[in-house]
Structures are given as C-alpha cells and as structure tokens.
From Swiss-Prot:
Sugar attachment sites: N233
GO function terms (MF aspect): transmembrane transporter activity
Gene label: PTR_A
Species: Candidozyma auris (Yeast)
Bilayer disposition of the protein: Multi-pass membrane protein
Lineage: Eukaryota, Fungi, Dikarya, Ascomycota, Saccharomycotina
Compartments, as annotated in UniProt: Cell membrane
Major subcellular site: membrane
Function: Peptide transporter that exploits the inwardly directed proton motive force to facilitate the cellular uptake of di/tripeptides.
SUPFAM superfamilies: MFS general substrate transporter (SSF103473)
Region described as Disordered: spans on this chain: 1-56
Signal peptide: none
GO biological process: oligopeptide transport; protein transport
Protein name: Peptide transporter PTR_A
Length: 589
C-alpha cells in the first residue's frame, strides 16, 4: 500500500489493532462519520485511521491492478435517457420489421403486402432504408457537436421522427390511400423517419454516457473493511450494457407489430409505434432539469478535419499539426486536441471491416423474412422470428458478463479486438446455417427451387419445412451482436475526445450505411434459385473479413490502456472521464 498522508491529529501514541478487530473498528468509523462525532475517531486504532484516510484518494497503478473495481451510483438522468432510447428503438423495430412484407407482397398474397415489389425489389429498398438510417447520423452528429448540443438535437430529431411515422400510418390505411399514394407515402415516410432516427441515434448514446460524473477512480473503504476502487469506468460499462439491453427490449415490439400486421392490417402495426414514440419527447421535456448538457465545441469537427488533413499530407504524421512544433502556423487548437484527433483516427481504422458485418446482419430484416415466407408458418407471421434475436441478446448479455467473460479471462485476456473477431465468426456461421437451410427448402416440394412460383395451384403453398428450423440463424446473429456490435459501440465512444463523441459515434454507425450500399448492389441476386449461393458468398466474405480484421488490428489490444490514459489528463481544470475497455472490468461488477 502506498504511503498515506499524515493524520490531522497526533496519533503517535495510539496502539495498533489486531487484524481480528479491524472490521468492527472500521464499522465504528463509518458509524461515527454518519453521526458527526469526529472527536471519538482519535480513539480508534491507527491502522483503521490509515484506511479511513485512504477513502477518497487516487489509487496507485499497483492498486488499480490489484483492488476490486466497483461502480458509482447511476444518476437518474441516465435512466431517463435510456427510456428515450427504449421508445425510439421500440418504434424503429416495430415499424421496420413489417417493411419486407409491405414492400414485397401484394394484398392478395400470403403473407399479405401492399407494394408488390417482389423479393429483389423489396430487398433493394430495404437496404436503402438501412443505408439512409445509418448515413444520417453524420448530419445529426454535426448539428449536435457544432450548433445545438446533444440534448437539443435529440429533441429536434424526435419531432421529425414523429412526422415521418404519422405519414407512414396515414398512407397505410386502405380506405385513405391508393397504391400510388401508398408507394409515395412510404418513400417519403422512410426518408423522414431515417433522418429522425439518424439524428437521435448518433446523440443518445453519447448523451447517456455524458451523465456520468467526470471524476477519476478513487479508493473507497467498504464497511466490511475491504479497500476497493470506485471507478467511473465500471459505471459507464454498466450504463452501456444497460443501454444496449434497452435497445433489445424495445426491439421486442416486433412481436406486437407483426401480430397486428398479420391479424388486423399494416396500419394497426404502424399505429402502435406512433403512440409509443410519444413517450420520448415527454421524457425529454420532463427530465430537462436533470440532464447534464456538455457545451458545444467551437468548430470542433471542422478543426479536426483540418488537423487530420495536415497529418495525412505528411504521411499520417500528426506532429505536422502540433502547435508546439509549428508556432508560426498559429493553429487554433492545443496539443491535447491533436492527441485526441490522433486517437480518434486510430480508432476509426478498426471500423473499416464493419460494412461486411452489417451486410450480413442486414439479412435478418430482409432475406430471412423472405426465407421464412417460403416455409410452413403454422399460423405465425413470417417476420415474427426477429424477436429471437432480441431475446437472445437479452438473455446472453448478463450470462456473458457474469460467467463467460470472467471464465475466459482466467486463461487469457479477452479484449475488444478479440471480441469483435468472434462477432464476425458468429455472423459468418449464421450465413452458413441460412445457406444450408435454404438448400433444404429447395429440396422440399411442392415448388422446390421456386417456392410459391411454380404452378398456379401452388402459388400460395409454401415448401414443406417448418419455420422453427430458422431459429438458430437468428440466435447466431444475436450472439454476433453481443460480441461485435456492443464492443464497436463502446469502442467508438471510449476512443473519441469529449468534444467529438457524437461525431465519432456517427462514423461507427455510418459503416452500417456502407454495408447497406453493398447490399443494394447485391440485391439482384436475392431471388430463387440463387439464394444458396447468396448466403454462401456472405459467409465466406464475413469469415475472410474477420480474419483480416484480427491480423491487422490484434496489436491494438496491447495499446488499449495507453490510448485510454488520455482521458485521465486534465486541461483548463476540466476533468475528463477515465475509460477502459468493457472487457477489462466486467468480472469486477
């Protein structure tokens, strides 16, 4: 233990307590502190006073490694932001899950639809929807980081979001809209909703992390006498895992909306998300006094681009942008800003392979739905199995936290890059399973390689294979999300400077847009009898991408602590929150 500060009173003549008396004495310390009887503290053994003086001081590096880390209390404002995210994700998944049927089928088909764009047309438009939803976060982040701040940006984009859902709902009512009105209304609605969801999504996760007090880890002495480290890292990790849990609880809306779509009509499936989303602006308004609002940076994004440009022009050497080395240039930023931008660029390299992952992930909301439509549904909606993905995540997040990750760490470190690699592997295995399943669908009658596309009497008759067999594909995608998506979300936040949290988060999200763009290009292959080869190609691509990712970036695991140390620095008396990888401390929670 490091040397403690000298006591305020003379303790040289106070005898030491034996180890067996420590716990009782320390309990008395806490009791005396609570009652305010400070004069009796002098009567306690010196060893207990040393522990008392430890309370609140910064730990040494050795103590950081050896002592158990615990979380701070999660602020009320974090819970309020989580409710906003729950409402937004409930609406997003509740709306988008019926989209494939809405776009692909006609009102006379089983499952029924509206726009009758066929599989390849619906898949292309589905990928456009995903592309738009994940390219708009760039705009939302720019607005937040440059002009409005995160809270105000979320409020603005929530209003836009509501307008889009309202248009979708109205144009899906059969008595109100014709075919042309439904098609035009659908396109306008997804553009407006995509703008709204992009603006909310790029800002809500940084906002929830901003609610954590910006303090360094400190030693805390528990009533049991155990010395632990009260670590904001653990608090942020708890918040992010809870945040992702809220996302997937919200995604369970697919059970309700697909059932309404199946048993009533699409308008009923869209009315529920419209009503539920109204919770978001209400919570934002009522919780306004409680939110921590980080001030808007001064042209931070423009300056970061200029700083990066100078580095790229000099072969990625950020020394070219350092004011101390080039005082004559009059750069309007500090040394620390350059280091923050360098770290952000360093982290963004990790995102380069994510478009392949998101391309594979996107199969869950388009081709998987179409595949289920070729199978015997036994009264179930063909798009309801997406709930398996959410249920998998809800169940296995705590299992991974409490058991799987700690068990692996007993034998080897399990850091961010390794987790992302295994996320790619699970996604690849999901495509392998889907390809094998598609092969067996083609082996069954009555239409074999052209389900519902053969003789007229079999137009509405699926091939003889049970929909439940598709379940493992959704399970594998869910496991890949726990490893790749959550870790990527955390990596984007922790490696971003305080003034650029929203922007770097949006860069991570925009990789989904690139994956969707690839999906649009590949959508002509999404038709019978080519689907086995579609899934095979995706499986191989994801496997190769995962292997290349690990080969290129595995050394980032060794540098993670070095990168995270930047957040312990202080500038202009503003403390920045300390961050380490989620994988470092889950076992201590």
């Amino acid at each position: 233990m490091s040397e403690t500060k000298p006591a305020a009173n003379d303790l040289s003549n106070v005898p030491s307590a034996s180890d067996s008396d420590k716990d009782n004495s320390l309990d008395k310390v806490h009791s005396l502190e609570k009652t305010g009887v400070h004069e009796d503290i002098n009567k306690l053994p010196s060893s207990d006073l040393e522990q008392l003086e430890d309370d609140g001081r910064e730990p040494t590096l050795e103590e950081m490694k050896k002592l158990r880390h615990i979380s701070e209390k999660i602020p009320l404002s974090c819970w309020l932001v989580a409710i906003v995210e729950l409402a937004e994700r409930f609406s997003y998944y509740g709306l988008s899950t019926p989209f494939q049927n809405y776009m692909q089928n006609s009102p006379e088909d089983k499952p029924k639809g509206v726009l009758h764009l066929k599989n390849s047309g619906a898949t292309a438009l589905s990928y456009f929807w995903q592309f738009w939803c994940y390219v708009t976060p760039i705009f939302g982040a720019w607005i937040a980081d440059t002009y409005t701040g995160k809270y105000n940006a979320i409020c603005i984009f929530c209003g836009i979001y509501l307008v889009g859902i309202l248009i979708l709902f109205i144009t899906s009512i059969p008595s109100v809209a014709s075919y042309n009105t439904s098609l035009g209304g659908f396109i306008v609605a997804i553009i407006i909703i995509g703008l709204g969801t992009g603006g909310v999504k790029s800002n809500v996760s940084p906002l929830i992390a901003d609610q954590i007090p910006k303090t360094k880890p400190v030693i805390k002495v528990l009533k049991s006498g155990e010395r632990v480290i009260q670590d904001p890292n653990i608090t942020i990790q708890n918040v992010f895992m809870f945040f992702y849990l809220m996302i997937n609880i919200g995604s369970l809306s697919v059970i309700a909306t697909t059932s309404l779509e199946h048993h009533v009509d699409f308008w009923a499936g869209y009315l529920l998300p419209l009503c539920f989303f109204c919770i978001a602006p209400l919570v934002l308004l009522l919780g306004r006094p409680y939110y921590v609002k980080v001030p808007v940076g001064e042209q931070v994004i423009a300056r970061s681009f200029r700083c990066t440009y100078l580095a790229v022009k000099n072969k990625f050497n950020f020394d070219a942008a350092r004011p101390s080395l080039h005082p004559e240039a009059g750069y309007p930023w500090s040394e620390k800003f350059v280091e923050e931008v360098r770290r952000s660029v360093y982290a963004c390299k990790v995102f380069v392979f994510y478009p392949i992952y998101w391309l594979v992930y996107g199969q869950m909301i388009n081709n998987f739905v179409s595949q289920a439509g070729q199978m015997e549904l036994h009264g179930l909606p063909n798009d309801i199995l997406q709930a398996i993905n959410a249920i998998t995540i809800i169940i296995f997040i705590p299992i991974c936290e409490r058991f799987v990750y700690p068990f692996i760490r007993r034998f080897t470190p399990f850091r961010a890059i390794t987790k992302i690699f295994w996320g790619f592997m699970f996604a690849s295995s999901a495509m392998v399973y889907a390809g094998v399943l598609q092969h067996f669908i083609y082996q069954q009658g009555p239409c074999y390689e052209f389900p519902k596309e053969c003789a007229e009497e079999f137009r509405q008759v699926p091939n003889r294979i049970h929909i439940a067999i598709q379940t493992p594909a959704y399970f594998l995608i869910g496991m890949s999300e726990i490893l790749a998506s959550i870790t990527g979300l955390e990596y984007a936040y922790t490696k971003a400077p305080v003034s650029m949290k929203s922007f770097i988060m949006s860069l991570f999200l925009v990789t989904n847009a690139f994956g969707s763009a690839i999906g649009i290009a590949l959508s002509p292959t999404s038709k019978n009898p080519k689907l086995v080869w579609t899934y095979t190609g995706l499986a191989v691509s994801c496997f190769i991408a995962g292997c290349l990712f690990y080969i290129i970036f595995h050394h980032y695991n060794d540098k993670e602590d070095e990168l995270n140390q930047l957040d312990y620095m202080e500038e202009d008396e503003v403390r920045l929150q300390p961050i380490t990888s989620i994988t470092e401390s889950l076992a201590a929670r």
